């Protein structure tokens, strides 16, 4: 039986990182990890509409600004971004929000970008928020090939209403996967 593969590609650009992820379609997967140093203009060529893109940093600090800006100048759309936040209006990932490049954002703190909030309430952007520790563990688990995990943090709140829930040791837990 041939295994599907998921490829984790880390680009290190001036101390910042961008990881491209393909969506996991089956659990029986071969994991390939590739690390390269590339120019931002070369990294941009690898991103296609519909991709899942993971960006480091928080609050417009520590993220690959040049890469974000170069992608903002393309016609790429329907991206899912995994990032702590969505920048501020028209700054950092806020450019992607303003350009309507995103279909979904997964992270911890989106309320700083009022344009993202407006698109969310208008039903034009899917935002999936979670506590910071759950976000970090989701990334770690995904990088290790773990399909998901149960956590009690946030269980029973509006943030986890869409998640599978179980009671474990008399505590409500919800299933988390990126």
What does each of the following model-derived ranges do?
Residues 3-7, 24, 28:
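Polybasic, lysine-rich low-complexity intrinsically disordered segments
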Residues 30-178:
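Conserved alpha/beta enzyme-core scaffold
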Residues 16-17:
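Serine residues within intrinsically disordered or low-complexity segments
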Residues 8-12, 21:
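Aromatic (phenylalanine/tyrosine) cluster motif
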